[in-house]
UniProtKB/Swiss-Prot annotation:
CDD domains: Transaldolase_FSA
Protein's UniProt name: Probable transaldolase
Catalytic reactions on record: D-sedoheptulose 7-phosphate + D-glyceraldehyde 3-phosphate = D-erythrose 4-phosphate + beta-D-fructose 6-phosphate
Protein source organism: Leptospira biflexa serovar Patoc (strain Patoc 1 / ATCC 23582 / Paris)
Family that this chain belongs to: Belongs to the transaldolase family. Type 3B subfamily.
Length: 214
């Protein structure tokens, strides 16, 4: 399962990149707005050292303008993936991008039906929002399983990019259910390393190492 970071914070991205564990980045207008920087500048800087997919979202809601914005975003770097909302106008844009060989990430997916429509339009990635579904009383993890089964039934190549991942259990479960990729905030990434037995075990090793002769 590929690991993406859901952030526009350059320091966070560099920390994970230096570990050799980073496969890509997802961003959205809300995340980039927090940086206080120009949208395209942030994407360009990320792409300068992250060579995997970097999702950058269009801001329009009509297909012609989405296509115009997406074409501009795709010029920033070869690894830019144009992020498009899962609405009818978005599907028009996705089809147009697919015909031009431009990768897309269809976002705000909350049903398996939506995921199938996005795949038929030619989406490279589909982003089901696990945590947000949980928030309103639905099973976000079950959605991952449903999409995986449908895609496998028909040999669909669209990659499942699990999003809105809130904690390590989400991370583990989307992996078990066959997500191709997961995107998570830096805070959740840090949690993946944590376990009290790891901490206590390391403390014991460090203490015992003081008794060794090198």
């Amino acid at each position: 399962m590929n690991l993406f970071l859901d952030t526009a914070n350059i320091d966070e991205i560099k920390k994970v990149h230096e570990l050799g564990l980073l496969d890509g980045i997802t961003t959205n207008p809300s995340i980039i707005a927090k940086s206080g920087r120009k949208f395209t500048e942030v994407i360009k800087e990320i792409c300068s050292f992250v060579k995997g997919p970097v999702s950058a979202e269009v801001l329009a809601t009509d297909a012609p303008t989405m296509i115009k914005e997406g074409l501009e975003l795709s010029k920033i770097a070869e690894n830019v993936v144009v992020k498009v909302p899962l609405i009818p106008e978005g599907m028009k844009a996705v089809k147009a991008f697919a015909e031009q060989g431009i990768q897309t990430n269809v976002t705000l997916c909350f049903t398996a039906n939506q995921a199938l429509l996005a795949a038929k339009a030619g989406a490279t990635f589909i982003s089901p929002f696990v945590g947000r579904l949980d928030d309103v009383g639905y099973d976000g993890l079950e959605l991952i399983s449903e999409i995986r089964e449908i895609y496998d039934n028909y040999g669909i190549e669209t990659q499942i990019l699990a999003a809105s991942v809130r904690h390590p259990i989400h991370f583990k479960e989307v992996a078990l259910r066959g997500a191709d990729c997961v995107t998570l905030p830096y805070s959740v990434f840090e949690m993946l390393f944590k376990h009290p037995l790891t901490d206590s075990g390391l403390a014991k090793f460090v203490e015992d190492s003081k008794k060794l002769n090198w």
